[in-house]
A protein has these predicted regions:
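Residue-level signature of the transmembrane alpha-helical core
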Residues: 21, 25, 29, 60, ...
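Selective hydrophobic functional segments
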Residues: 57-110, 117, 197-243, 247
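Hydrophobic alpha-helical transmembrane segments in multi-pass integral membrane proteins
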Residues: 155-165, 200, 205, 253-264
Length: 264
Protein backbone atom coordinates (compact mmCIF):
# COMPACT_ATOMS: atom_id res chain seq x y z
CA UNK A 1 0.00 0.00 0.00
CA UNK A 2 2.91 2.34 0.77
CA UNK A 3 4.15 2.23 -2.83
CA UNK A 4 0.70 3.16 -4.13
CA UNK A 5 0.62 6.16 -1.83
CA UNK A 6 4.08 7.17 -3.08
CA UNK A 7 3.15 6.75 -6.76
CA UNK A 8 -0.26 8.43 -6.62
CA UNK A 9 0.51 11.03 -4.00
CA UNK A 10 -2.97 10.47 -2.56
CA UNK A 11 -3.66 10.42 1.19
CA UNK A 12 -4.29 6.92 2.54
CA UNK A 13 -8.01 7.49 3.17
CA UNK A 14 -8.61 8.81 -0.36
CA UNK A 15 -6.57 5.99 -1.92
CA UNK A 16 -8.74 3.39 -0.16
CA UNK A 17 -11.88 4.98 -1.59
CA UNK A 18 -10.40 5.05 -5.10
CA UNK A 19 -9.39 1.39 -4.90
CA UNK A 20 -12.84 0.43 -3.63
CA UNK A 21 -14.44 2.31 -6.53
CA UNK A 22 -12.22 0.46 -9.02
CA UNK A 23 -13.05 -2.89 -7.41
CA UNK A 24 -16.72 -1.89 -7.48
CA UNK A 25 -16.54 -1.15 -11.21
CA UNK A 26 -15.15 -4.63 -11.96
CA UNK A 27 -17.67 -6.24 -9.60
CA UNK A 28 -20.58 -4.33 -11.12
CA UNK A 29 -19.50 -5.27 -14.65
CA UNK A 30 -19.36 -9.00 -13.93
CA UNK A 31 -22.39 -9.01 -11.67
CA UNK A 32 -24.62 -7.26 -14.21
CA UNK A 33 -23.96 -10.04 -16.72
CA UNK A 34 -23.99 -13.26 -14.68
CA UNK A 35 -23.79 -12.38 -10.99
CA UNK A 36 -20.82 -13.24 -8.80
CA UNK A 37 -19.64 -9.66 -8.37
CA UNK A 38 -19.41 -10.25 -4.64
CA UNK A 39 -16.37 -12.42 -5.32
CA UNK A 40 -14.60 -9.15 -6.13
CA UNK A 41 -16.28 -6.58 -3.89
CA UNK A 42 -16.42 -8.57 -0.63
CA UNK A 43 -12.65 -9.36 -0.59
CA UNK A 44 -12.00 -5.70 -1.43
CA UNK A 45 -14.06 -4.67 1.59
CA UNK A 46 -12.23 -7.17 3.81
CA UNK A 47 -8.85 -5.79 2.72
CA UNK A 48 -9.79 -2.50 4.42
CA UNK A 49 -9.75 -4.40 7.75
CA UNK A 50 -13.47 -4.02 8.31
CA UNK A 51 -15.04 -6.67 10.58
CA UNK A 52 -16.58 -9.43 8.41
CA UNK A 53 -20.17 -8.51 9.25
CA UNK A 54 -19.51 -4.83 8.45
CA UNK A 55 -17.78 -5.80 5.20
CA UNK A 56 -20.86 -7.81 4.20
CA UNK A 57 -23.20 -4.99 5.17
CA UNK A 58 -21.15 -2.37 3.32
CA UNK A 59 -21.06 -4.65 0.28
CA UNK A 60 -24.87 -4.81 0.31
CA UNK A 61 -24.98 -1.02 0.18
CA UNK A 62 -22.68 -0.93 -2.84
CA UNK A 63 -24.55 -3.79 -4.52
CA UNK A 64 -27.77 -1.78 -4.42
CA UNK A 65 -26.23 0.69 -6.86
CA UNK A 66 -24.86 -1.96 -9.22
CA UNK A 67 -28.02 -4.08 -9.25
CA UNK A 68 -30.16 -0.96 -9.60
CA UNK A 69 -28.15 0.34 -12.56
CA UNK A 70 -28.32 -3.01 -14.38
CA UNK A 71 -32.02 -3.45 -13.55
CA UNK A 72 -32.90 -0.08 -15.08
CA UNK A 73 -31.02 -0.97 -18.27
CA UNK A 74 -32.74 -4.35 -18.62
CA UNK A 75 -36.17 -2.86 -17.88
CA UNK A 76 -35.72 -0.09 -20.44
CA UNK A 77 -34.83 -2.71 -23.05
CA UNK A 78 -37.88 -4.86 -22.19
CA UNK A 79 -35.77 -7.86 -21.15
CA UNK A 80 -37.63 -8.56 -17.89
CA UNK A 81 -40.67 -10.84 -17.55
CA UNK A 82 -42.21 -8.65 -14.87
CA UNK A 83 -45.45 -10.65 -14.75
CA UNK A 84 -43.40 -13.51 -13.26
CA UNK A 85 -40.78 -11.51 -11.38
CA UNK A 86 -43.32 -9.43 -9.40
CA UNK A 87 -44.79 -12.66 -7.97
CA UNK A 88 -41.35 -13.76 -6.76
CA UNK A 89 -40.20 -10.44 -5.25
CA UNK A 90 -41.89 -10.87 -1.82
CA UNK A 91 -40.34 -14.32 -1.35
CA UNK A 92 -36.85 -13.08 -2.19
CA UNK A 93 -37.28 -10.07 0.11
CA UNK A 94 -38.41 -12.11 3.13
CA UNK A 95 -35.83 -14.83 2.48
CA UNK A 96 -32.99 -12.32 2.35
CA UNK A 97 -34.04 -10.78 5.66
CA UNK A 98 -34.13 -14.21 7.30
CA UNK A 99 -30.73 -15.11 5.88
CA UNK A 100 -29.17 -11.86 7.08
CA UNK A 101 -30.48 -12.40 10.59
CA UNK A 102 -29.01 -15.91 10.52
CA UNK A 103 -25.57 -14.86 9.30
CA UNK A 104 -24.79 -12.98 12.51
CA UNK A 105 -25.24 -16.14 14.59
CA UNK A 106 -24.70 -19.19 12.35
CA UNK A 107 -21.52 -20.28 10.53
CA UNK A 108 -21.93 -20.92 6.79
CA UNK A 109 -19.51 -23.88 7.05
CA UNK A 110 -22.23 -26.51 6.74
CA UNK A 111 -23.85 -24.89 3.73
CA UNK A 112 -20.72 -24.62 1.58
CA UNK A 113 -20.34 -28.35 0.68
CA UNK A 114 -23.86 -28.34 -0.77
CA UNK A 115 -23.12 -25.21 -2.81
CA UNK A 116 -19.83 -26.69 -4.08
CA UNK A 117 -21.56 -29.86 -5.31
CA UNK A 118 -24.38 -27.87 -6.92
CA UNK A 119 -22.01 -25.48 -8.71
CA UNK A 120 -19.86 -28.35 -9.96
CA UNK A 121 -22.85 -30.20 -11.42
CA UNK A 122 -24.33 -27.11 -13.09
CA UNK A 123 -20.96 -26.07 -14.56
CA UNK A 124 -20.50 -29.51 -16.11
CA UNK A 125 -24.08 -29.42 -17.39
CA UNK A 126 -23.54 -26.07 -19.14
CA UNK A 127 -20.21 -27.20 -20.62
CA UNK A 128 -21.60 -30.37 -22.18
CA UNK A 129 -25.12 -29.17 -23.06
CA UNK A 130 -24.07 -26.37 -25.37
CA UNK A 131 -27.59 -25.33 -26.41
CA UNK A 132 -28.75 -24.83 -22.79
CA UNK A 133 -29.87 -21.25 -22.28
CA UNK A 134 -29.34 -20.28 -25.93
CA UNK A 135 -33.03 -20.13 -26.92
CA UNK A 136 -35.83 -18.40 -25.00
CA UNK A 137 -38.39 -21.22 -24.69
CA UNK A 138 -40.41 -19.87 -21.78
CA UNK A 139 -44.16 -19.37 -21.79
CA UNK A 140 -46.50 -18.26 -19.00
CA UNK A 141 -45.26 -19.79 -15.72
CA UNK A 142 -48.29 -21.01 -13.75
CA UNK A 143 -49.44 -23.77 -11.43
CA UNK A 144 -46.82 -26.14 -10.03
CA UNK A 145 -43.98 -24.43 -11.90
CA UNK A 146 -44.88 -21.08 -10.30
CA UNK A 147 -44.89 -22.59 -6.80
CA UNK A 148 -41.47 -24.11 -7.46
CA UNK A 149 -40.23 -20.69 -8.59
CA UNK A 150 -41.59 -19.09 -5.41
CA UNK A 151 -39.85 -21.68 -3.22
CA UNK A 152 -36.65 -21.16 -5.19
CA UNK A 153 -36.90 -17.37 -4.80
CA UNK A 154 -37.32 -17.77 -1.03
CA UNK A 155 -34.33 -20.13 -0.83
CA UNK A 156 -32.09 -17.89 -2.91
CA UNK A 157 -33.14 -14.90 -0.81
CA UNK A 158 -32.04 -16.78 2.32
CA UNK A 159 -28.75 -17.69 0.63
CA UNK A 160 -28.12 -14.07 -0.37
CA UNK A 161 -28.65 -12.83 3.15
CA UNK A 162 -26.64 -15.68 4.66
CA UNK A 163 -23.65 -15.97 2.30
CA UNK A 164 -24.18 -13.60 -0.62
CA UNK A 165 -21.64 -13.94 -3.46
CA UNK A 166 -23.05 -15.94 -6.35
CA UNK A 167 -26.70 -15.13 -5.73
CA UNK A 168 -27.19 -13.69 -9.20
CA UNK A 169 -25.54 -16.75 -10.72
CA UNK A 170 -27.89 -19.13 -8.92
CA UNK A 171 -30.88 -17.00 -9.92
CA UNK A 172 -29.83 -17.22 -13.56
CA UNK A 173 -29.63 -21.01 -13.22
CA UNK A 174 -33.17 -21.11 -11.88
CA UNK A 175 -34.60 -18.94 -14.65
CA UNK A 176 -32.83 -20.96 -17.35
CA UNK A 177 -34.32 -24.18 -15.96
CA UNK A 178 -37.69 -22.41 -16.24
CA UNK A 179 -37.08 -21.93 -19.97
CA UNK A 180 -35.47 -18.50 -20.33
CA UNK A 181 -32.31 -17.97 -22.37
CA UNK A 182 -29.16 -16.66 -20.67
CA UNK A 183 -29.86 -13.01 -21.49
CA UNK A 184 -33.48 -12.90 -20.28
CA UNK A 185 -32.58 -15.06 -17.27
CA UNK A 186 -29.87 -12.55 -16.36
CA UNK A 187 -32.35 -9.66 -16.67
CA UNK A 188 -34.95 -11.35 -14.45
CA UNK A 189 -32.28 -12.35 -11.95
CA UNK A 190 -31.04 -8.79 -11.59
CA UNK A 191 -34.46 -7.53 -10.42
CA UNK A 192 -34.66 -10.21 -7.72
CA UNK A 193 -31.01 -9.62 -6.80
CA UNK A 194 -31.73 -5.92 -6.26
CA UNK A 195 -34.64 -6.88 -4.00
CA UNK A 196 -32.60 -9.31 -1.92
CA UNK A 197 -29.77 -6.77 -1.58
CA UNK A 198 -32.23 -4.13 -0.36
CA UNK A 199 -33.80 -6.44 2.22
CA UNK A 200 -30.42 -7.56 3.53
CA UNK A 201 -29.14 -3.96 3.65
CA UNK A 202 -32.10 -2.87 5.79
CA UNK A 203 -31.21 -5.52 8.38
CA UNK A 204 -27.50 -4.64 8.33
CA UNK A 205 -28.36 -0.94 8.75
CA UNK A 206 -30.62 -1.75 11.69
CA UNK A 207 -27.80 -3.74 13.31
CA UNK A 208 -25.27 -0.96 12.61
CA UNK A 209 -23.10 -3.18 10.42
CA UNK A 210 -22.59 -0.82 7.45
CA UNK A 211 -19.69 1.51 6.67
CA UNK A 212 -21.55 4.13 4.66
CA UNK A 213 -18.43 5.79 3.21
CA UNK A 214 -16.88 2.57 1.91
CA UNK A 215 -20.25 1.33 0.66
CA UNK A 216 -20.92 4.50 -1.32
CA UNK A 217 -17.40 4.55 -2.81
CA UNK A 218 -17.72 0.97 -4.02
CA UNK A 219 -21.28 1.67 -5.15
CA UNK A 220 -20.11 4.55 -7.35
CA UNK A 221 -17.87 2.14 -9.20
CA UNK A 222 -20.64 -0.44 -9.39
CA UNK A 223 -22.96 1.99 -11.18
CA UNK A 224 -20.43 2.45 -13.98
CA UNK A 225 -19.49 -1.22 -14.20
CA UNK A 226 -23.10 -2.42 -14.18
CA UNK A 227 -24.09 0.09 -16.86
CA UNK A 228 -21.31 -1.11 -19.16
CA UNK A 229 -21.86 -4.80 -18.40
CA UNK A 230 -25.63 -4.80 -18.92
CA UNK A 231 -25.34 -2.90 -22.21
CA UNK A 232 -22.65 -5.31 -23.41
CA UNK A 233 -24.83 -8.30 -22.48
CA UNK A 234 -27.77 -6.89 -24.45
CA UNK A 235 -25.54 -6.13 -27.45
CA UNK A 236 -23.81 -9.52 -27.55
CA UNK A 237 -26.71 -11.70 -26.39
CA UNK A 238 -26.83 -15.11 -24.72
CA UNK A 239 -23.57 -16.39 -26.22
CA UNK A 240 -21.54 -13.81 -24.26
CA UNK A 241 -23.53 -14.38 -21.08
CA UNK A 242 -22.89 -18.14 -21.37
CA UNK A 243 -19.11 -17.67 -21.63
CA UNK A 244 -18.97 -15.25 -18.69
CA UNK A 245 -21.32 -17.53 -16.73
CA UNK A 246 -18.95 -20.50 -17.12
CA UNK A 247 -15.94 -18.36 -16.18
CA UNK A 248 -17.59 -16.99 -13.04
CA UNK A 249 -18.96 -20.36 -11.87
CA UNK A 250 -15.52 -21.94 -12.30
CA UNK A 251 -13.81 -19.20 -10.27
CA UNK A 252 -16.57 -19.33 -7.67
CA UNK A 253 -16.25 -23.10 -7.40
CA UNK A 254 -12.48 -22.94 -6.90
CA UNK A 255 -12.80 -20.22 -4.26
CA UNK A 256 -15.49 -22.09 -2.32
CA UNK A 257 -13.41 -25.28 -2.34
CA UNK A 258 -10.35 -23.36 -1.13
CA UNK A 259 -12.31 -21.59 1.62
CA UNK A 260 -13.90 -24.85 2.76
CA UNK A 261 -10.60 -26.74 2.88
CA UNK A 262 -8.99 -23.85 4.78
CA UNK A 263 -11.56 -24.17 7.57
CA UNK A 264 -11.04 -27.91 8.08
Amino acid sequence: MEWLIAVTGLPFDILILVLLAVAGAFAGFVDSIVGGGGLISVPAMLLTNLPPSVALGSNKLSSIFGAGSASITFLRNHMVDFSLVRKLLPFTFVGSMLGTLAVVSLPPLYVKPIIIILLFCVTLFVVFKKDWGEINRTSQVTGKALYICMAFALGIGIYDGFIGPGTGTFLIMGFIFTGFDFLHASANAKILNFTSNLASLLVFLYLGHVNITYGLATGAGQIIGAYLGSHLAIAKGSSLVRVVFLSVTTVMLLKLVYDYISTL
